[in-house]
Amino acid sequence: MRRSKADVERYVASVLGLTPSPRQKSMKGFYFAKLYYEAKEYDLAKKYICTYINVQERDPKAHRFLGLLYELEENTEKAVECYRRSVELNPTQKDLVLKIAELLCKNDVTDGRAKYWVERAAKLFPGSPAIYKLKEQLLDCEGEDGWNKLFDLIQSELYVRPDDVHVNIRLVELYRSTKRLKDAVAHCHEAERNIALRSSLEWNSCVVQTLKEYLESLQCLESDKSDWRATNTDLLLAYANLMLLTLSTRDVQENRELLESFDSALQSAKSSLGGNDELSATFLEMKGHFYMYAGSLLLKMGQHGNNVQWRALSELAALCYLIAFQVPRPKIKLREGKAGQNLLEMMACDRLSQSGHMLLSLSRGKQDFLKEVVETFANKIGQSALYDALFSSQSPKDTSFLGSDDIGKIDVQEPELEDLARYDVGAIRAHNGSLQHLTWLGLQWNSLPALPGIRKWLKQLFHRLPHETSRLETNAPESICILDLEVFLLGVVYTSHLQLKEKCNSHHSSYQPLCLPFPVCKQLCTERQKSWWDAVCTLIHRKAVPGNLAKLRLLVQHEINTLRAQEKHGLQPALLVHWAKYLQKTGSGLNSFYGQLEYIGRSVHYWKKVLPLLKIIKKNSIPEPIDPLFKHFHSVDIQASEIVEYEEDAHITFAILDAVNGNIEDAVTAFESIKSVVSYWNLALIFHRKAEDIENDALSPEEQEECRNYLTKTRDYLIKIIDDGDSNLSVVKKLPVPLESVKQMLNSVMQELEDYSEGGPLYKNGSLRNADSEIKHSTPSPTKYSLSPSKSYKYSPETPPRWTEDRNSLLNMICQQVEAIKKEMQELKLNSSKSASRHRWPTENYGPDSVPDGYQGSQTFHGAPLTVATTGPSVYYSQSPAYNSQYLLRPAANVTPTKGSSNTEFKSTKEGFSIPVSADGFKFGISEPGNQEKKREKPLENDTGLQAQDIRGRKKGRGVIFGQTSSTFTFADVAKSTSGEGFQFGKKDLNFKGFSGAGEKLFSSRYGKMANKANTSGDFEKDDDAYKTEDSDDIHFEPVVQMPEKVELVTGEEGEKVLYSQGVKLFRFDAEVRQWKERGLGNLKILKNEVNGKLRMLMRREQVLKVCANHWITTTMNLKPLSGSDRAWMWSASDFSDGDAKLERLAAKFKTPELAEEFKQKFEECQRLLLDIPLQTPHKLVDTGRAAKLIQRAEEMKSGLKDFKTFLTNDQTKVTEEENKGSGTGVAGASDTTIKPNAENTGPTLEWDNYDLREDALDDSVSSSSVHASPLASSPVRKNLFRFDESTTGSNFSFKSALSLSKSPAKLNQSGTSVGTDEESVVTQEEERDGQYFEPVVPLPDLVEVSSGEENEQVVFSHRAEIYRYDKDVGQWKERGIGDIKILQNYDNKQVRIVMRRDQVLKLCANHRITPDMSLQNMKGTERVWVWTACDFADGERKVEHLAVRFKLQDVADSFKKIFDEAKTAQEKDSLITPHVSRSSTPRESPCGKIAVAVLEEITRERTDVIQGDDVADAASEVEVSSTSETTTKAVVSPPKFVFVSESVKRIFSSEKSKPFAFGNSSATGSLFGFSFNAPLKSNNSETSSVAQSGSESKVEPKKCELSKNSDIEQSSDSKVKNLSASFPTEESSINYTFKTPEKEPPLWHAEFTKEELVQKLRSTTKSADHLNGLLREIEATNAVLMEQIKLLKSEIRRLERNQEREKSAANLEYLKNVLLQFIFLKPGSERERLLPVINTMLQLSPEEKGKLAAVAQDEEENPSRSSG
């Protein structure tokens, strides 16, 4: 409330009366001046502020306030002087500088001070529009001299703000003032593409004036005719825009004048028409706009006039709209806007949309209205009446366009709704998503019977916005979706419609349209709605102004709660019901399953919000909020009588959602409980669909009866609907379909029931009519009722509507044509590749590699993107030159590229086995290639026994198709097995039907034989067959690319509870440089283990999720504040973030001090929790004696465990075991495991202490195996290695490769091949396991093997470097990444390529082949940079790049050049390169530990019995020899007696119970991994005896092993069985031998164990060792903590000592000072002499200095005596 002058005077008098001091009275003058300023007494305000300034002259606020008072009095000079003084006192007042500049420019522009202050303000406000206007004023006053500067100023401002209307108009005016009309026209032409300018009334007025002036000028006459036509085109477009804007903002008289001017422009352009050029097309379109605006002006005149004849005006307006609607759309493109859209096309859509809707609105409820209008006014009389109504001038009609136009050829053409919907989409683009336009369109559709296409409108505006969100409970702006915006538009249209109805009910003529034309109608939405819509558009299109983003987000966030009916939404229940009904109706009309699910799901959401409100309405009304987003209208309030009906609608919607989700039984139950025609209709649909599903196959009598029952129920429900409709006509309105559709469907059902009564359509004469049923699926009978897609909804993803079956034949035909084209292209590529040169890019010599069976075929389009899911997250993968498509396609073996059968339920786990086979063999999860013709194909001769099974299996939904004659997998021995004993995996599977192809070879090297056939067209056809799918009766559309199986994310935090989590910045103190270093930004968590109660602190970096803090919380830890900050805490802990325990000093910085204090409280609370838990921290174990014993015991058990594991895994022995004979699916054992060692690597090891039953048929490690064998032996090596897991439950039998890449490719040539699990790679990790190892606190998740494409390649060079790419556009080098650059050579085809990936992200930044024509060149100015040109595939596509790589050292750069040249040479010679990392040969240790060798030598010390001669070859082949380059280890032949003698091994076991020794194989009770324990048969063969006697000293050469392996492969089945039985005697012939103690040795422990017992012993020992290792680690961590504390104590002691020394020295100095003062002031004599020793001692004077000091003392004694004398 403003105070009056009298109030202020009374208050001032009272205050001054209480203030005796004059200075204090003056000090209150500022406050008094503000009070008088509020009372508008400016003179009194100046008086008091001046008194204040007299005592406080340096107060800038007072001077500014005085300047404001002078400015109000328009005393500019004094105001500027006060402001200037204020700025001098406080220079930070930027706005005051701008104020001074504006005042000076306003007062006198020529004043030199104005220029100074404008330049000063420009430095403070760069790019400000206000500064531009001031500069413009300064330059305007210079006249013609300043035009050039003004032009430069405007151009620079346009560059910054091209949408500024004032700047554009100013430029055009400058052109016009300087008579440069041509430049002005050119600028107008260019600026027409700017949407912001086209929507400005001032700009369009300027354009019209400029173009008219140009056309009338002499310059136009001198120019060519095309320029004149282009200017006329721009003029007509500008008139159309100006007319639209004038209709919306100006009065009727101005509209008439502008329309008349538009008329004259059209008339002048009419005479120059000819041809099909831009002017003709624009003229025709502008003619339509002219008549549309004429009709809108007529209705506007009726709105603003008095005593208006609405009938006459509406008839003339309808005539105008008819002419506008019948103007054809332009056929040529005029120009494109910013979005690349045709301008004329958008304007035509807008014209047709507005005209069409207005025609429907004017003719609504009036029969033959348009026909009467055409008959009455489509003539000269009507034309004259129209002219008189629009134009008030007395100009002759013949000279005007409207008076001379021919309007007599108008047809009575009413717009079609489908055409209008299409025009609306284009009109929305023209208006750029204006909420006013969208609301107007919604109001037009609100009166039409069809639903508006709001979804299509919004998709045009927001292309990338999701349709629905899964987070309806949140209000985050990021969660906004299309459905939210659709609901918002529905609400705006709904409330606008109700508001218009209320206004029109009082005074409304039948000829007056409910909603006026778009240009003349008032604002249809509220300001709140408009601001929210604009904020959403700004956020989605990311056009927010900096600094305004937070405000927009808050605005959007607030209204999302209302749109989703969350919390206190304040929505009227009637609006919620309207939303729910609209969404349910729209969803039911969609053909998309997901569209139905989203729409009906949102409808259910709103119904659930309405139901509680309906219960409240029964008791009382719902209060209306004060300022709602959507206004409440009492005319639509829900009455109590309507509540039951709405509740029924809600439950029907719930049931429909159940049906859509596939819960058919729940939906049927819900529908049956509701007695309504809508529920009857839905029940009829459900039962009819069930009957159709049964009809799809040949019917048995039971299925035929079931189908008849469903059809009977359908008929009954349809009859109920018809009966209810006849009795009550209002019921028919509730039906989602017309009543005629119900009757048509009833007739169809009745016809089907009659067919069943005649004997059934599918079962006649006791025979199945397969052909008829198939024909029925592809071509439905014309008499049968087929439900329209718009009349129904899908019930589940697996149940598509019947109309999709009509497309099967078309899709099949297209698939066949595509396959034929693919084959032709493959043959063409094959022929071209044969004739091409060796170095053709990129298909050179990259045929399919030899890969294991089971790969589903390869794509032969090299270089094309492959849309298959690999192991990585990327879906689209481009094939690089060194990647073969077979490897990429491997993980997507069960992807259906085109269509898949929805009935296929077969998985590898269902039948209990998963076996890798060739592409010709049987397949799992993929239907057999071919279409319906495949079903009628004649079965092959070899598969006669399986054909019937195939048909039955297909009917039951198992897509199992066993292979043809080329199948290479058989289970001959297993199928013939009759023994029920022995080792079995799992129980018998009742679903298992046996195996096919018995008697054939168990495993064969298919791809080894295919090496010479890789480029034949037949193989391409086989590969393509893998993608062919079989049409099923029930079609299911799946995505082309199937995502990989979801890998469960294991973080190590699963069993822990989050007690605290907060975002912080973590620092680590670096002791070397003595400073804090940032470690990461992320959430710091305190986790509590639910099992043992331990607490730990964990933090991961954002995005990369790298652990940057991970340590236990102990009671000894304490937080200390970081000096200089109240938001940071520091502490010390033994951290495991890098994997090893390391004492770290950490600090966490929080956003606010409150968060830091909260963290401290939580930390201390956690420490108090630890006091209640039994202490398990390491400091309890600090007992030197006990610790020493624990360490000793752990080391002993660790050593023994290693020796025992080494013997069991037996890396130097080959394993060959006989297949077990099992029953059912219990198949165990391995077939001929044959491995050919490479020249540089040892053979792989088979580890039998880990068993693996997994679903995967073949691991990706097959293609990445480090075993490099010959082409003939490579496939068996990779295929036939088995791993069996410990779990034997169920019948999930899996053949899986045990090979895994244990080291990087760069290390393969300097270490032996390590195969198996990570913890048991004995050969290469012996030294690593001897060292101490600290496990992290958080266990890592299981390793997910990643395929990089570099598995079958050796690394010949690898070093860190920085790579650059030359950008031709900007003409400079650009950095592409930093990482390891590698030169890789393929083992198979010897091709060499360069690969480089970025650090951390591993993104490819170089990937190309090395070709002979490539050469490295030094970059000018440096010798460490190499430059070359190559066709690179780093971005997935072939692209010629200029690359440069820079190394840190010159030696590395030279080495890269050397290896590069060697690679080209080796590639030409087809030879392998010696890798750079293995040039220096390093001595290799024995792959077996010394203790393990001692154990074996001790075991084999006694001479064994003689081995039978027939077994020599097998015994030799069982010995695995490591083909290292240095020395080969001793080959040991197993003795029949097995004695544990080594003390290290003996300590492992504690039980001396003797049991038979067997390892899992029923026939190998007397054998262990190839070592025979059975009684050997006597033989006189001396040769074999010598071999056996040599024992461990005998050596077997690798070539002999290879020969024996190959001979094993080539043997027949009979010989194979003989050999296996020879080396592994059967159970009947085996004799159990005990392990006897040697006579010469002291009595030792005898061991006879089974394999299970040994495995159990090994497990318990491993657990014990792990426990002891854990204790060791705790001791080590405690010791580290104690050592750190000792260091801290020592440093503290040293600090104290230094302080003591300083204090002592300070005391000594003080004492010396006192002594010297006494010496100086004492009188000469004996007292002074007594101080001399003290001074000499403290100052450590030399003898000479002592003498001088004594002489000084003596002189001082003699001087007084001399003076007295």
Swiss-Prot record:
UniProt repeat feature TPR, residue ranges: 26-59, 60-93, 648-681
Domain RanBD1 span(s) in chain numbering: 1036-1172, 1333-1469
Gene Ontology CC: cytoplasm; nuclear pore
Record flagged with keyword Ribosomal protein: no
Keywords: Phosphoprotein, Repeat, TPR repeat
Amino acid composition bias (Acidic residues), ranges on this chain: 1317-1329
Biased composition (Polar residues): 1231-1244, 1580-1593
PROSITE patterns: GRIP (PS50913), RANBD1 (PS50196), TPR (PS50005), TPR_REGION (PS50293)
GO biological process, one term: NLS-bearing protein import into nucleus
Chain intervals with Low complexity compositional bias: 778-797
A GO molecular-function annotation: small GTPase binding
InterPro entries hit by this protein: GCC2_Rab_bind (IPR032023), GRIP_dom (IPR000237), PH-like_dom_sf (IPR011993), Ran_bind_dom (IPR000156), RanBP1-like (IPR045255), TPR-like_helical_dom_sf (IPR011990), TPR_rpt (IPR019734)
SUPFAM superfamilies the record matches: PH domain-like, TPR-like
Protein origin, superkingdom: Eukaryota
Pfam families listed in its UniProt record: GRIP, Rab_bind, Ran_BP1
Start-end of Basic and acidic residues biased regions: 1594-1617
All residue ranges annotated as the GRIP domain in the record: 1702-1752
Modified residues (Phosphothreonine): 19
Location of the region described as Disordered in the Swiss-Prot/TrEMBL record: 760-804, 1216-1247, 1306-1330, 1580-1621, 1746-1765
Subunit organization: Interacts with GTP-bound ARL1.
PANTHER family: E3 SUMO-PROTEIN LIGASE RANBP2-RELATED (PTHR23138:SF175), RAN BINDING PROTEIN (PTHR23138)
Further remarks about this protein from its record: One of the 8 copies of RANBP2 clustered close to the chromosome 2 centromere.
Listed name of the protein: RANBP2-like and GRIP domain-containing protein 8
Organism from which the protein derives: Homo sapiens (Human)
